[in-house]
A protein has these predicted regions:
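Acidic/polar, glycine-rich intrinsically disordered N-terminal extensions of enzymes
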Residues: 1-48
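Translation machinery proteins
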Residues: 39-63
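Polyanion/phosphate-binding surface patch
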Residues: 55, 60-79
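A generic local secondary-structure boundary/capping motif
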Residues: 61-64, 114-118, 125-132, 174-179, ...
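A generic, well-ordered mixed alpha/beta core segment in the N-terminal half of proteins
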Residues: 70-132
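Conserved mixed alpha/beta catalytic, RNA-binding, or beta-rich assembly cores of soluble enzyme
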Residues: 136-209
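Conserved small/polar residues in nucleotide/adenosyl-binding loops
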Residues: 237-243
Length: 243
């Protein structure tokens, strides 16, 4: 049995909140750089170049990449042989509170969605815990801005809709979102399960490295087809995708 102090959890979450808002993971940086190098449309290329300059400035000055510093989504893989010395959830919330305060990050979270009173420290966080074997504890902080979060959709498809119905729903979702999620975007797609489970799967999918395709060849091909359809001219996105 391994014991981890609540203070260590707090310190880690606070650091990750700041890093996640001021740095991009290497796979995302590489994807953005590749996009700006290959983009043929001058206006789009100029936009990507501006995003790249903004990213460099944020890194050099330790400033947020975006003014929307989002809701802190904290994903935890917690080993069954780990004992947390103290309150685990309280430690995470304290880490978010400290990270958003020490990092001078915008506080966006309200205590009640209808009364709209800001909590003033960006808590509570959204905490997702997955139990795994062993004595490890892996914490990932993903700030989720609501420009993209508010464009999320769920659809209960009929069996008869098949894979074509699924692909059409994904492409239509991106089309309807337009510029609201602040492109370029990363799609987190969940398929199957209950209403709540599929939303969890979609959120978790955002953590996958961008440069690693799905290990299942069927879904890897589906990813390629969706990417091609989404990036196609608008007038073509209603067509049946190649299979």
């Amino acid at each position: 049995m391994r014991t981890i102090s609540a203070q260590e959890i707090t310190d880690t979450v606070a650091r990750l909140c700041i890093e996640a808002n001021t740095r991009l993971p290497q796979d995302v940086q590489a994807a953005l750089d590749k996009a700006r190098q290959e983009e043929p449309w001058p206006l789009a290329k100029n936009t990507l170049d501006l995003l790249w300059s903004n990213l460099s400035a944020a890194r050099e000055k330790d400033l947020p990449i975006c003014q929307d510093t989002g809701m802190a989504c904290v994903f935890v893989e917690l080993g069954t042989d780990v004992h947390i010395d103290g309150s685990f959830e309280a430690a995470i919330h304290e880490g978010v509170r400290r990270g958003y305060t020490d990092g001078y990050l915008r506080k966006s979270i309200v205590a009640d969605p209808l009364r709209r009173g800001n909590t003033g420290d960006n808590t509570p966080a959204a905490i997702i815990v997955h139990l795994v074997d062993g004595d490890g504890c892996t914490i990932t902080v993903a700030p989720k801005g609501f420009g993209s979060e508010n464009m999320s959709r769920i659809q209960m498809l009929k069996p008869a809709d098949g894979v074509e119905g699924f692909k059409k729903f994904v492409v239509d979702t991106v089309r309807l979102a337009g510029s609201n999620p602040c492109p370029p975007i990363v799609l987190g797609i969940g398929v199957g399960g209950s209403f709540d489970k599929v939303a969890y799967l979609a959120k978790k999918a955002l953590l996958r490295p961008l440069d690693i395709p799905n290990p299942d060849p069927y879904y890897a091909q589906l990813e390629r087809e969706l990417l091609a359809a989404i990036n196609a001219p608008v007038s073509y996105t209603h067509l049946t995708l190649p299979t």
